[in-house]
Amino acid sequence: MLPASLQRKAAAVGGRGPTNQSRVAVRVSAQPKEAPPASTPIVEDPESKFRRYGKHFGGIHKLSMDWLDSVPRVRVRTKDSRQLDDMLELAVLNERLAGRLEPWQARQKLEYLRKRRKNWERIFEYVTRQDAAATLAMIEEANRKVEESLSEEAREKTAVGDLRDQLESLRAQVAQAQERLAMTQSRVEQNLQRVNELKAEATTLERMRKASDLDIKERERIAISTVAAKGPASSSSSAAAVSAPATSATLTVERPAATTVTQEVPSTSYGTPVDRAPRRSKAAIRRSRGLESSMEIEEGLRNFWYPAEFSARLPKDTLVPFELFGEPWVMFRDEKGQPSCIRDECAHRGCPLSLGKVVEGQVMCPYHGWEFNGDGACTKMPSTPFCRNVGVAALPCAEKDGFIWVWPGDGLPAETLPDFAQPPEGFLIHAEIMVDVPVEHGLLIENLLDLAHAPFTHTSTFARGWPVPDFVKFHANKALSGFWDPYPIDMAFQPPCMTLSTIGLAQPGKIMRGVTASQCKNHLHQLHVCMPSKKGHTRLLYRMSLDFLPWMRHVPFIDRIWKQVAAQVLGEDLVLVLGQQDRMLRGGSNWSNPAPYDKLAVRYRRWRNGVNAEVARVRAGEPPSNPVAMSAGEMFSVDEDDMDN
């Protein structure tokens, strides 16, 4: 049986062929229809093996970029952004070199201005266009102008309704200002009227005074004429009577003018002259007693060893800048680990060396790379021929009892270092804190030597709950020490600027009364170093030691707690001492009326005021001749009556 396709072909051929004259009938039985066979591809598809994994497998792959949204963005610093940051750093450096602000204060203000990036870019354009030095004042001026320009732009964009509201607000403010101006004018008129009344009263009083003077002179003339009329027997008494008013008048003229007008009344006894010697002023009395305070730093204070820094705060390859007697210095350790101190000013262009770094025990200047050793000599000058005998000043430096000591005086320093800085036996150091205090160091020392103020000043810190005693007294002795009554506190002053105190504690945080420090079980030892940094500033080094609770040194972050407590106590004192300093600058005195419990501070002030004379006498080989110029070891031997006013 032929396939259906062949049957159709055969039928077509048979019907068209001319040779077939007769039609052949073929009878085909009914058969089931078969499905046509599948076509077999001639060439195999090379991608067919991939299509079995999916219709898109093996095609063009598109990577989804959604994962980039979760990737942290990395900020790329461009040249413009670096220039903006460089302007901030340059302004901080200029403020530090000028000494107008501390670097952290300038940086804080500049960082605040940089938060508004659009303003900061315009500030940079303004400073660059002006070709001015990048200082804080210049940047603040540029910021003000930028704010004005931006506000003008904002004003231009303001709607008419908003402008109308602003105009109404300004009108209300003008009306209020006019009312205040009218009130001020009325008060001024009242004050002028009162001034005129006072002038009239003063004129009346002046007339009365002149009239009384004429009356007194008339009475004197009458008395003299009466005595002269009695005869020569009373001539001597009349002469005495004449001399008495004359003497009084002469002394009255020489006496300094007072704020109130006083009237001299002549004695009725013309035979006895009146002693009218002028009394000394309180300022003269204070000067004679050595109690004259001043903001100036005596030159005689230079000839002492000063603990300038804690040893633990001066590791290797570290620069510690500080000021002493108004001069900049920087400390570091040399290649042997020994402390050194040189002037913080490069010998080349005056750049602060403390901005540089320590390279193999020598300080490298950050400006041109000059290097200086511990003696101040320049040892390296890159990019230029080396010049000898170039260097900076250096201070004698030593290390003892956990302190770095420097000698700022003239000539050779003392051979031995002080030995009182070490804590007493049985005590362990718990805290070492350095603070720059904006107070003259003498005022701060006097505050530390005064304990009578504690119940009134430190009511929120260590003296909380202390009752006010009936009396407070300091008992001094000749060993540069003494103790307070009724508090269990031993206190001492060590020249030139150190105070030591040992406090007896009943239990941690509480103090006992009516006993001495030696009678207490637990003790707290304090050392305050008040180094004269510059005029009106003190570099304060504070060390605290305890003879109990040794495990407390290992408590995490305990140093932060001690710093916070010390800052709180110092803040309570600082408000008062700054007020004293302000009154001193205005001509006032903090030694008008000393009290008995001021004994220790009084003797410090006497020693301080006589230190120049003391140094001069010691250089001349003479011993001290009076308590004002007495040495440190003798200043506690003055009697109790030196506190009398």
Swiss-Prot record:
Annotated localization: Plastid, Chloroplast inner membrane; Plastid, Chloroplast thylakoid membrane
A Pfam entry, by short name: Rieske
UniProt topology in membrane: Peripheral membrane protein
Coiled coil: 105-218
InterPro entries: Cholesterol_7-desaturase, PaO, Rieske_2Fe-2S, Rieske_2Fe-2S_sf, Ring-hydroxy_dOase_2Fe2S_BS
Binding site for Fe cation: 446, 450, 453, 458
This protein's record includes keyword Iron-sulfur: yes
Enzyme Commission number, as recorded: 1.14.13.122
Positions of [2Fe-2S] cluster binding: 346, 348, 365, 368
GO molecular function: 2 iron, 2 sulfur cluster binding; chlorophyllide a oxygenase activity; iron ion binding
Compositional bias of kind Polar residues: 259-271
Gene Ontology terms describing biological process: chlorophyll biosynthetic process
Enzyme class: oxidoreductase
Reaction(s) catalysed (UniProt annotation): chlorophyllide a + 2 NADPH + 2 O2 + 2 H(+) = chlorophyllide b + 2 NADP(+) + 3 H2O
UniProtKB keywords: 2Fe-2S, Chlorophyll biosynthesis, Chloroplast, Coiled coil, Iron, Iron-sulfur, Membrane, Metal-binding, NADP, Oxidoreductase, Plastid, Plastid inner membrane, Thylakoid, Transit peptide
Entry-linked SUPFAM superfamilies: Bet v1-like, ISP domain
Disordered, as annotated region: 1-46, 258-287
GO CC annotation: chloroplast inner membrane; chloroplast thylakoid membrane
Gene3D superfamilies referenced in this protein's UniProt entry, alphabetically: Naphthalene 1,2-dioxygenase Alpha Subunit, Chain A, domain 1, Rieske [2Fe-2S] iron-sulphur domain
Domain Rieske: 305-406
Function comment: Catalyzes a two-step oxygenase reaction involved in the synthesis of chlorophyll b. Acts specifically on the non-esterified chlorophyllide a and not on chlorophyll a.
PANTHER family, sorted: CHLOROPHYLLIDE A OXYGENASE, CHLOROPLASTIC (PTHR21266:SF19), IRON-SULFUR DOMAIN CONTAINING PROTEIN (PTHR21266)
Protein name: Chlorophyllide a oxygenase, chloroplastic
Organism the protein comes from: Chlamydomonas reinhardtii
Gene responsible for this protein: CAO
